[in-house]
Amino acid sequence: MKRVLSFALSLVMLLSITGGLGLTAYAGDTYYETEDNDDYSSADYVPVNSTIYGVCREYDPDWYKFTLSSPAKVNVQFSFNRADADGVWHVIVYKYDGDGDYSQIDDKNVYLYDGTYTFPSMGLPAGTYFVRVYGDYAACGRQYGVTPKCSYVSNWETEFNDSYTAADPLNFGKTRYGVCRDYDPDWYKFKLNAAATVSVSFSHTKSSADGVWHVIVYLSLIHI
């Protein structure tokens, strides 16, 4: 269950929520994959807010990369022409950790009969990111597009805020937005310099779907 959430705030306290080939590139342009982009080291570069098009052959993973110069809200869009056929692309988003290592951030099986898919908003730190695309069945041989949509904003969570030591700061009277993925706790913190009455507002868009957020407020007994 993935939904946008927000905070409004009116002793240090913590809040936990669970729920490559070289191209001359300019944002907003259109690009095409260059084979063989079959692993992260040969990933095709695509600037944020631009689209790169590719075609998966059988047993042919395609890798793409984009970079963020500073923390940003990112939505990766995977687009194609919908068809009533049995085909699927396996799309995975990774963060590059350096030294040949990368961490999975999100993934989705995108079916040909479902149409274009946009990943939920992610608040990501500056760095290099990869998108891996692998097609099966009727998805092979069909063109798709990958667009890393990016907005440089300061009011979104920054992954990976998965523990109290990496908690995102909250400012009083300001709203901060985030998205919980499966098994992805989000932590936030705010600090009081003197005793005060504080209310924490947790807001989201109402839906008839079956979902729940577990929201816990903690008092930190250590200096962080």
Located regions from the model:
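Hydrophobic core
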Residues: 9, 13-17
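Positively charged n-region of N-terminal signal peptides that target proteins for export
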Residues: 1-8
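Conserved small/polar residues in nucleotide/adenosyl-binding loops
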Residues: 222-224
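C-terminal edge strands of extracellular/lumenal beta-sandwich accessory domains
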Residues: 28-46, 64, 93-97, 125-170, ...
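Sec-dependent signal peptide cleavage junction
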Residues: 17-31
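Extracellular beta-strand-rich recognition modules
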Residues: 76-78, 129-135, 200
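Non-catalytic, beta-strand-enriched accessory regions in extracellular/secretory proteins
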Residues: 50-71, 116-119, 130, 174-195
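Extended, low-complexity, turn-rich repeat/linker tracts enriched in Gly/Pro/Ser/Thr and Asp/Glu
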Residues: 80-88, 138-140, 204-212
